[in-house]
Structures are given as structure tokens and as C-alpha cells.
Swiss-Prot record:
It comes from the Eukaryota. It is found in: Endoplasmic reticulum membrane; Cytoplasm. Catalyzes the hydrolysis of the vinyl ether bond of choline or ethanolamine lysoplasmalogens, forming fatty aldehyde and glycerophosphocholine or glycerophosphoethanolamine, respectively and is specific for the sn-2-deacylated (lyso) form of plasmalogen. It holds the Pfam family YhhN. The gene is Tmem86b. Enriched in liver. Also detected in brain and testis. One of its GO terms (cellular component) is cytoplasm. This is Lysoplasmalogenase TMEM86B. It is an enzyme of class 3 (hydrolase). InterPro entries: TMEM86B-like. Residues 1-23, 69-74, 118-123, 164-171, 219-226 are cytoplasmic. GO terms for molecular function: alkenylglycerophosphocholine hydrolase activity; D-lysine 5,6-aminomutase activity; identical protein binding.
């Protein structure tokens, strides 16, 4: 894929020229609002709380189906969203942490497929890797032995997704940065020490990240008009 095809500028996407974008994004915004308004305590895991948490991501799956042009890129982005929703549901229950991590790892692989591997830009990979290693070198000090391998494997995949998204550019790059930040806050709050407003920061940046990542699929003239 051509990294220059990063999608239409956001101000264009949300203009009167493309009313279908705003119309099909409304369910996502409402689902996000519902999640933050209900704010179900994390110590009360249930299928209801899992559904409420997953709803915004599932709305984005429908959004892509309704608005984005067809093709492998759109399907890969939808696959990433579905896996993310599975990961969201798993992380409701602490005992399903490994399943959630695996689901998000597959989601990032879908994003990797959507953004491609050309142009390579190894210098950018070096920069993201050095930043990731700095963070994970501190995080490793607080991980139990059984957590080291899965967390590091996930970090490697996340870093790869960040690299390719930055090469792709546009909203995808901002989405990947927010996703990485969200995961960083979540990991620090989970394994190092409790951070104030960690859940609010994590979930708000996470939902924004997913939206920005999938907006990269919207390219003119392929936008659907219904």
C-alpha cells in the first residue's frame, strides 16, 4: 500500500461534503458516552459490563462497513476491531488477562497487514524500538516471572504496529500513538503502582485511538454515499 494514502483530512471528512461519516459515527459516540456515564466498577465483572465496554468498538466495525470503500484494507481493519472487542471483553475478568493480551496481539497484526510494509523506513523503527525498550526496561522490574514473556511479546507487536502506522501517516499515526500511550498507562497502573484517573485516561485515549486508526481507511473517491 502507498503510505501517502493515509485518508482524507479530518476537517474534510467531517464537513457537509460527507454527511454519511457523521451519521454513521453517531452510534460510536453514543456508545462511548454510555460507557463513561454508567462507569461500571471494574470489581464487578459481568457480561453486561463486557458488552458496554465492547459496544463502541463494534460500532466502528459497522461504521467501516457502511462508509469505507471495500477491499483488503477495510477487511483487515474490521478484523482488528473484532479482535480488539474480544480483548476488551476478556480484560473484564482478571483471570482472562492472557486471552485478552492474545486477542489484542492479533488485532495489531491485522493493523500491520492493513498498513503494509512499504516503504520500510528502518530509521523510524529504530526510534520506536528505543523508546519502547526504555519503557519496558522499567516495567520488567515489576513483572512476575510468568508475565515477562507474554508482556514482552505483546510489546514487540505493539511497537511494530506503531512503526507501520507512523510510516502510513495521517490519522493512523495519531491513533497508534494514542493506543501505545493508553497501553502504557494501563500496564503501569496494573503492574507498577496505581495511577490517579488511570481508567479514565486509558479508556478515553483507547477509544480515540481506535477511531483515528480506522479513519485511515476513508479515501476519496472510494467513500460510500448511502
Amino acid at each position: 500500500m502507498d503510505a501517502r494514502k493515509e485518508g482524507l483530512p479530518l476537517e474534510t471528512l467531517f464537513s457537509d461534503q460527507y454527511p454519511q461519516v457523521r451519521r454513521w459515527l453517531a452510534p460510536f459516540i453514543l456508545a462511548c458516552s454510555l460507557y463513561f456515564l454508567l462507569w461500571i466498577p471494574v470489581d464487578q465483572p459481568s457480561w453486561v459490563s463486557a458488552l458496554i465496554k465492547c459496544q463502541p468498538i463494534l460500532c466502528l466495525v459497522v461504521f467501516l462497513w457502511a462508509v469505507a470503500p471495500g477491499g483488503s484494507s477495510t477487511w483487515l481493519l474490521q478484523g482488528a476491531l473484532v479482535c480488539s472487542a474480544v480483548g476488551d471483553a476478556c480484560l473484564i475478568w482478571p483471570e482472562a488477562f492472557f486471552y485478552g493480551t492474545a486477542a489484542f496481539s492479533v488485532a495489531h497484526l491485522f493493523y500491520l497487514g492493513a498498513f503494509g510494509l512499504t516503504p520500510l523506513q528502518p530509521g523510524l523503527l529504530l526510534c520506536t524500538t528505543l523508546a519502547s525498550l526504555t519503557y519496558y526496561s522499567f516495567l520488567l522490574l515489576h513483572l512476575e516471572q510468568g508475565m515477562v514473556l507474554p508482556v514482552m511479546a505483546y510489546g514487540l507487536i505493539l511497537n511494530s504496529m506503531l512503526w507501520r502506522s507512523l510510516v502510513w501517516g495521517g490519522s493512523a499515526s495519531w491513533g497508534a500513538v494514542l493506543f501505545t500511550f493508553s497501553d502504557g498507562v494501563l500496564a503501569w497502573d496494573t503492574f507498577v503502582y496505581s495511577l490517579p484517573f488511570a481508567r479514565l485516561v486509558t479508556m478515553s485515549t483507547y477509544y480515540a485511538a481506535q477511531l483515528l486508526l480506522i479513519l485511515s481507511a476513508l479515501r476519496n473517491p472510494g467513500l460510500k454515499t448511502h
